[in-house]
């Protein structure tokens, strides 16, 4: 019996309600080990802290979730439970399948263009992320009524930032 990740009990309900489908992320520090997450009126609602190559942590309204990489699988967990999981589609590093709340989403990421788009398999957009040329600020739009969309937007932010960081440390090779 397979267990499908669920965003419902672990993602703060008020957080999704207070963000009207968008947020901004800004790098804090010269080498951007941390991004401040800002809602309407530039109010901080959380932080994304990058760890090593395959891990990070997001803190928002007393909620803490961890991002982890295990082989070709990515996960976002809180209190030991999965909120969402993702894996590359086929051999592509730029296409992901994301699983959350019994649904499957497809995502396209372009780390060097600082863009990401996730949608349900039926085509309805769930999250869109676009960043500045330098990768120090990002704008995210997400479907406010889809409880997986906000964690997915933050997950996409992590994947783009972590991939760019890894590529630059490796001298431009992915």
Language model segments and positions:
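Short, well-structured hydrophobic secondary-structure segments
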Residues: 47, 51-82
């Amino acid at each position: 019996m397979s267990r499908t990740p669920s965003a419902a009990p672990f993602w703060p309900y008020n957080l999704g309600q207070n963000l009207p489908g968008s947020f901004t992320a800004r790098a804090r520090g010269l080498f951007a080990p941390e991004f401040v997450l800002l809602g309407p009126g530039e109010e901080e609602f959380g932080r994304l802290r990058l760890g090593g190559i395959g891990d990070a942590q997001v803190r928002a309204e007393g909620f803490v979730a961890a991002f982890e990489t295990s082989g070709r699988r990515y996960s976002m967990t809180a209190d030991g439970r999965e909120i969402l999981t993702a894996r590359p589609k086929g051999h592509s590093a730029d296409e992901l399948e994301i699983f959350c709340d019994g649904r499957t989403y497809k995502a396209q990421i372009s780390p060097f263009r600082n863009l990401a788009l996730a949608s349900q398999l039926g085509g309805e957009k769930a999250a869109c992320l676009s960043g500045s040329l330098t990768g120090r600020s990002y704008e995210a739009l997400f479907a406010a009524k889809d409880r997986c969309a906000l964690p997915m937007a933050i997950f996409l932010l992590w994947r783009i930032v972590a991939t760019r960081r890894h590529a630059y440390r490796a001298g431009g090779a992915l």
